[in-house]
Swiss-Prot record:
Enzyme class (EC, first level): isomerase
Physiological role: Formation of pseudouridine at positions 38, 39 and 40 in the anticodon stem and loop of transfer RNAs.
Lineage summary: Bacteria, Pseudomonadati, Pseudomonadota, Gammaproteobacteria, Lysobacterales
Organism: Xanthomonas axonopodis pv. citri (strain 306)
InterPro entries from the UniProt entry: PsdUridine_synth_cat_dom_sf, PsdUridine_synth_TruA, PsdUridine_synth_TruA_a/b_dom, PsdUridine_synth_TruA_C, TruA/RsuA/RluB/E/F_N
Substrates-to-products reaction catalysed: uridine(38/39/40) in tRNA = pseudouridine(38/39/40) in tRNA
Protein name listed in UniProt: tRNA pseudouridine synthase A
Gene Ontology biological-process entries: tRNA pseudouridine synthesis
Gene from which the chain derives: truA
One Pfam family this sequence matches: PseudoU_synth_1
Keyword Isomerase: yes
GO molecular function terms listed in the Swiss-Prot or TrEMBL record: RNA binding; tRNA pseudouridine(38-40) synthase activity
Residues annotated as binding substrate: 111
Length: 257
């Protein structure tokens, strides 16, 4: 039987979502599979909606897995969470259709990037906030970011390690706002390239400080040259909010579009 899980995690202590072999360091995937396998009393493999890098967090990562073990969804949720480290929790578990796929059934994915904009670096929230000491104009950043909307070639915001076959993605929404001392960037797309969100944020910061004009983002997009764009923003400010699926899959409302 196939199940879908909603998983929350603090990525600070992990080398990323993906299990990278025996000597690849701790991963969220390996921890989750070990816990599920213990509950099932048999090996369990999971497939996720979107892989995250080292230090990046997940608010509602969605995974699917198959198991012949007879467990109620609540049993999977509570039993798995009890076997996970404190930095990972299963938020919900529901039965899924046999043809549901956490990655390929998703219609969109959402990320949030938050950075503390003040002279003094964060102490209390240093693992979940990035930091920029220079004053940022969030309105200018928001205006510049709108040039990225639509289906475009995002080569200028793609890491050199990216293994995607092409750089075309459909950016459905991007919003920048200031909330007190925090500048927040929320972005939604059909899919993302490796480091795409962090590279966009790194370039928007240069607009926010006034180092670059607002139309620079459009110029970068058209130029498709990663070497002239802004630096990659640090990982700790990034959260994978989660994917969105069509209602036909009958998943919880927070991941249904």
């Amino acid at each position: 039987m196939r199940y879908a899980l909603g998983v929350e995690y603090d990525g600070s202590e992990f080398q990323g979502w993906q299990q990278l072999g025996e000597h690849g360091g701790p991963s969220v995937q390996a921890s989750l599979q070990a816990a599920l396998s213990s509950v099932a009393d048999a090996p369990v493999q999971v497939v996720c909606a979107g892989r995250t890098d080292a230090g990046v967090h997940g608010e509602c990562q969605v995974v699917h897995f198959d198991s012949d073990a007879r467990r109620e969804p609540r049993g999977w949720m509570l039993g798995t969470t009890a076997r996970l480290p404190p930095s990972i929790a299963v938020r919900w578990c529901v039965p899924a259709a046999d043809d549901f796929h956490a990655r390929f059934s998703a219609r969109a994915r959402r990320y949030r990037y938050r950075l503390l904009n003040r002279q003094i670096r964060p102490a209390l929230y240093r693992q979940t906030l990035s930091w920029e000491r220079r004053p940022l104009d969030a309105d200018a950043m928001h205006g510049a970011a709108q040039a990225l909307l639509g289906e475009n070639d995002f080569s200028a915001f793609r890491s050199v390690q990216c293994q995607a076959l092409h750089a075309r993605r459909h950016l459905q929404a991007i919003h920048v706002q200031r909330i007190g001392e925090v500048v927040e960037v929320q972005v939604q797309a059909n899919a993302f390239l490796h480091h795409m969100v962090r590279n966009i944020v790194g370039s928007l910061i240069l607009v926010g400080t006034g180092e670059q004009p607002a139309d620079w983002i459009a110029t970068l997009l058209a130029g498709r040259d990663r070497t002239v764009a802004g630096p990659t923003a640090p990982p700790q400010g990034l959260v994978f909010i989660g994917p969105l699926y069509p209602a036909e899959w009958h998943l919880p409302a927070e991941v249904t579009q």
